Amino acid sequence: MENWQATEILPKIEAPLNIFNDIKTYTAEQLFDNLRIYFGDDPSRYNISFEALLGIYCNKIEWINFFTTPIAVAANVIRFNDVSRMTLGKVLFFIQLPRVATGNDVTASKETTIMVAKHSEKHPINISFDLSAACLEHLENTFKNTVIDQILNINALHTVLRSLKNSADSLERGLIHAFMQTLLRKSPPQFIVLTMNENKVHNKQALSRVQRSNMFQSLKNRLLTSLFFLNRNNNISYIYRILNDMMESVTESILNDTNNYTSKENVPLDGVLLGPIGSIQKLTSILSQYISTQVVSAPISYGHFIMGKENAVTAIAYRAIMADFTQFTVNAGTEQQDTNNKSEIFDKSRAYADLKLNTLKLGDKLVAFDHLHKVYKNTDVNDPLEQSLQLTFFFPLGIYIPSETGFSTMETRVKLNDTMENNLPTSVFFHNKDQVVQRIDFADILPSVCHPIVHDSTIVERLMKSEPLPTGHRFSQLCQLKITRENPARILQTLYNLYESRQEVPKNTNVLKNELNIEDFYKPDNPTLPTERHPFFDLTYIQKNRATEVLCTPRIMIGNIPLPLAPVSFHEARTNQILEHAKTNCQNYDFTLKIVTESLTSGSYPELAYVIETLVHGNKHAFMILKQVISQCISYWFNMKHILLFCNSFEMIMLISNHMGDELIPGAAFAHYRNLVSLIRLVKRTISISNLNEQLCGEPLVNFANALFDGRLFCPFVHTMPRNDTNAKITADDTPLTQNTVRVRNYEISDVQRMNLIDSSVVFTDNDRPSNETTILSKIFYFCVLPALSNNKACGAGVNVKELVLDLFYTEPFISPDDYFQENPITSDVLMSLIREGMGPGYTVANTSCIAKQLFKSLIYINENTKILEVEVSLDPAQRHGNSVHFQSLQHILYNGLCLISPITTLRRYYQPIPFHRFFSDPGICGTMNADIQVFLNTFPHCQRNDGGFPLPPPLALEFYNWQRTPFSVYSAFCPNSLLSIMTLAAMHSKLSPVAIAIQSKNKIHPGFAATLVRTDNFDVECLLYSSRAATSIILDDPTVTAEAKDIATTYNFTQHLSFVDMGLGFSSTTATANLKRIKSDMGSKIQNLFSAFPIHAFTNADINTWIRHHVGIEKPNPSESEALNIITFGGINKNPPSILLHGQQAICEVILTPVTTNINFFKSPHNPRGRESCMMGTDPHNEEAARKALYDHTQTDSDTFAATTNPWASLPGSLGDILYNTAHREQLCYNPKTYSPNAQFFTESDILKTNKMMYKVISEYCMKSNSCLNSDSEIQYSCSEGTDSFVSRPCQFLQNALPLHCSSNQALLESRSKTGNTQISETHYCNYAIGETIPFQLIIESSI
């Protein structure tokens, strides 16, 4: 049988020299002819394998195409027949170091040869195609049959060639793709390479904390300044410099063959710069003067491995062209089939072909410059240089900038109306990706702020209890508070025991907090900082049963937030906002306020006025009896001393304004009383910001907005039992008062039984109860007007009515018969002196006696001795949630007491000071009237304060259960005596409940806290890759083709075994994120809906739950148990998607509650939104105890500031932010796993430690590779460290920093800055701010539109 050799399946004509296209065309034509021979009619021709023929063809086409692409500049191609059997290769290179000759008796360096080891990386690629059985059958038929058979045969042959061409094309693309992936695996980002080149360390030198931190900071800065450098501007020098830095930052190849890829001027290409088509086109446009098309001499052959006897690689030499068809078939089936001589066609003198390439001139070097768009076009594989990027942004809402420190840095003059929206911003403005202005205000964040979890302290308290207690000095500062509850009837008996003991009372945490200024509060030496974990709850330590326990109580009102977190000026600015909203037309009350202030602070206040107050005690009939006396007292003191009497008593003011309009008193004095009442009503109308007609849970909605309207807050001075519509527990003795235990006063008859019990603990009340309107006005007076105008220089007092009446009035002639009573004068010196002091010295004895008798006539309406009542009541339904369900607020009120504004001396034995409330506990009055208190003040002079520093008796000092706490008394002690101060105290009574927050937010009133908004956006980006010439060797052999026959088809599998060897002396390739291709998310204002994230939580009260969900925009009710279980287990989205999306995928903004005093500079540079840095380069993250300490130990300063934190509500362990966004707590919260949280990466401890370990490893490994293999460990393999890809794609997570977003608190500032393109500089305009962006996205977006 004739043995067909390759003569009929090999080229018959030599291909034109150095022409790639001719090679490809010629090879394809010969394959077609050879296939006809192969499928001819002679069976003897089957001795040449069809699979081998396909493999040789694919090899030829595959490599010819590879050599024509610019990426081949970075390759060094080597043939090795046994590469498929090689799993791990190790190539040794002997490199002789260059030397410099020296003189002047300096010893020259010795000849040095370094052996560098490079490891191979196996990466096979494969492709397959199917040929149907029908097609193969037609191929096997002879060409000599009918015309139809020949046509079918030719069609079948074309089918084979199409499949073969597609497979060969796939191998071409696969080879380039595999090589590109290999380059990327050893191409660290440029910012890493530059940082390591600047901070080179010896490979055996351990990095210090300072070095590691410096490198980390340099990495961060270079990353942020190099991102999207093609989009930032069209500055040629800037872009040229970055590209030049890319080229200079990499090392040369070990194989420096200048014959490959050389221009006609014999200038070798130093490397190749590759990128996606968009970036390359942009570079071509910008750097056109440096770009040219040159004819380059490209290789069309590859090297060959030579194997020694020991089967080890000993050298690399360049050998013949790839095994062409001629040489293969000549030796096929012979003894010389494994010996391939040099090709006769491509000899040494003709081993290169001319190829046109785009080149870029960088300095004195020439690099290839192109894209691989044609490789990936219309394929299902993305260009590896087109990558995704995830960036997280943060920006503030509601940060307060004090007007006294306000200034403007705006170059262009921006005029803002003088409105409180501009003076206390409650909105933030920014642009989305389509340059549409977005606005977020407090009403928009209600789905996060009004969620039940936010108003539940259960987990906060539990986590704080699980922590170790303070030790040492901090224990003595924080853990000395004792809660003393005592029978109200015994409080008066033991009232002065504290002062008699002369022991200093330890300050509670609230007092300590409010003694600090804003800057000191955030410092690590603030011992109370660990207790500030929640904006709506006070946390502290108490002593109970000789053990230290954690106490958590609701703050109830905005005014109870510590002043360093909500300062005085903020409360006043917020009050102005309420005034503006209410459109309050403030009349001129200045003169009235001035005279009232002078009267309240005057040291010469008549004691007769206190006696009259005691006799009248708010009773209209008693007042009418004493009307003449009262009018004379008022007239004398107003005309002679310019003092307005009875301005310390609400009941007296109301009685005077209602019943003395008949010119009994001077008109000016009466006008002041009327102005006082008008002012109180004005305050009431101003703070009524909700719809008074709306009801919720059977109560007016305004009750939920401001505590002054809430019946649960009682007036501190009462003379008759108030309405108890809220079922408060009122106690005067051992048992709570009820309708049966409270007795009624019978003034019109001889009430002997009441007179006998006048000094007992039995409580008597009038038949007439004050109206709800009167009760609200009285609370406004005592909690707002009086403290603001007296600066807390008032004191509660009790009166021993029994002894007072007996000593002053049960003497002659008061107890004489009527005739004798009318005729005889009064002889009581005490009473006469009181009358002369109160009425003036001009009265005769007869006149003073007449006045005394008038006083005596009012005794028919006398009240009982003063009592202290304890009021224990739960909060409103909106605040009764979570742990607060069982919370009972405590108030102590004076029943039949009075408010002193000056000490009583003459009647001291009948009146006793009762410091029962911080508004009414003036140490001056107390010390003057009680010797024990005066001694106490002399012993501890620092306690002589009106701001809460004067200690109250322990049963009355229940700070954490009271409604008004230390911040109230601190403000009222130092506030100016003005209408604004009164309004501010009233506004501070705004509640911290979800209903109150919703009402205020929807009315554009600041709710008392700020917010940090965090959003993650996704981007498609384009990267540039630079690689030096011959940076990587590609080891290959012929493709292996196998056939798998099936019933209906035969599958042919092509496998190309490849192995890659890095040839760089160091990092020979690098990448850079150059161009923003697409913004995938909308960069908008969609707020995270916590009702979907935590779906099963609901408020305790069903009506409250329904109201909240409706007013914050949650349409669906709470899910059923089965729905909730499915959501928790499998995840779910509890809302329908919007019908129209104008701006793409919605990015979610999450809310972190933040103090309004957070430094605005915190938002002007990249920081961790939790308020404390989490990237711990100064700590070994493998030491988890030290790492956790760096994260959560606030006794240490933050790594970026001199403070411990900027937001304790998020940075402390177990704080509100930590609970919401730390995934470790989600099991306790029943979390919806389908909800994406951009904040989780900054709060989850396990993720933070993991990324820190990865960052630590990345820096350490790159430092080891910062030197080349010539001056470091020659075994180092220069490839990207693990985690580099994640670092580049999610830099914010690894850096633990969010980026500032271009935003402003006022739309005018945003438009002004956008108009000038000044978006990267942060500015301040008095109370408004504009935050500059780190990456100029606005400029990038504008240039791309």
Curated annotation (Swiss-Prot):
Q: Which Pfam families match?
A: Herpes_MCP (PF03122)
According to the UniProt entry, the coiled-coil residues are: none
Major location (coarse):
virion
| Recorded family membership | Belongs to the herpesviridae major capsid protein family.
Keywords, sorted A to Z: Capsid protein, Host nucleus, T=16 icosahedral capsid protein, Virion
Q: How does it assemble?
A: Homomultimer. Makes the hexons and eleven out of twelve pentons. Interacts with triplex proteins 1/TRX1 and 2/TRX2; adjacent capsomers are linked together in groups of three by triplexes, heterotrimeric complexes composed of one molecule of TRX1 and two molecules of TRX2. Interacts with scaffold protein; this interaction allows efficient MCP transport to the host nucleus. Interacts with capsid vertex component 2/CVC2. Interacts with the small capsomere-interacting protein/SCP.
Protein name, entry field:
Major capsid protein
What gene, per UniProt, encodes this protein? MCP
- Relate the protein's function as given in its record: Self-assembles to form an icosahedral capsid with a T=16 symmetry, about 200 nm in diameter, and consisting of 150 hexons and 12 pentons (total of 162 capsomers). Hexons form the edges and faces of the capsid and are each composed of six MCP molecules. In contrast, one penton is found at each of the 12 vertices. Eleven of the pentons are MCP pentamers, while the last vertex is occupied by the portal complex.
A GO molecular function assigned to this protein is: structural molecule activity
Native source species? Human herpesvirus 6A (strain Uganda-1102) (HHV-6 variant A)
Q: Which GO terms describe its cellular component?
A: host cell nucleus; T=16 icosahedral viral capsid
Give its localization: Virion; Host nucleus
